[in-house]
Amino acid sequence: MTEFEKQLDKMAHGNGFIAALDQSGGSTPKALGNYGLDESAWNNEEEMFDLVHKMRERIVTNPSFTGNRILGAILFENTMNGTFEGKPSTDYLWSKKEVIPFLKIDKGLADEKNGAQLMKPIPGLEQILAGAKKQNIFGTKMRSVIKEANESSINSVVEQQFQIAEQILESGLIPIVEPEVDINCAEKSKAESFLLNAIETKVNNLGSKQIILKLTLPEKDNLFLPLANHKNVLRVV
């Protein structure tokens, strides 16, 4: 069994949660603030990223951070290209901790339009994916947001997610598809029904390929059970 096959098996059957270690430039100051460092602790962006990397390294090297509790970790691109205890970060996570490495690939959300926020364009995606594969990344993560029960907008969100997911699959990586439904959505249950229909249409056309779905807890019990049981869905997280 290859390392990738071992990771596939763990992602399908293992226990634990996926740790988010993917703060980008916009969210890093808040993350460091919660950690106890205010903006006086750095003079420029480079120093800020050095500090947040040290914070992440402290987290992942802690004895409690292991594959017994954690399925995977989502990394920012800088973290993917960095090291933990002198070892490439992705190799450290898997070989030392048995934690599956993922890469955050989206560049944030576009402005809200018709009750949804699509992802901003991802320039150089092909190169990013090639670099991720070279660094032994297992999969990717990308997020959109649905704020209203607008069927057309929800279809657009799902269309964009799966269009990019196909490119990710072609590169040999497993995408986490995340069309988040805002918990404050006035017609959340209705929006989730539209979302279920849109996703089912797409996963039915994946052939033998598999994706991971990251979905908001639905209003209706077991609404997404058909997706969790779908042969083309590795896991719902």
Predicted regions, residues:
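Alpha/beta catalytic barrel-like cores
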Residues: 1-138, 146-148, 198-202, 207-211, ...
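Eukaryote-skewed repeat-based solenoidal scaffolds used as protein-protein interaction platforms
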Residues: 133, 140-224
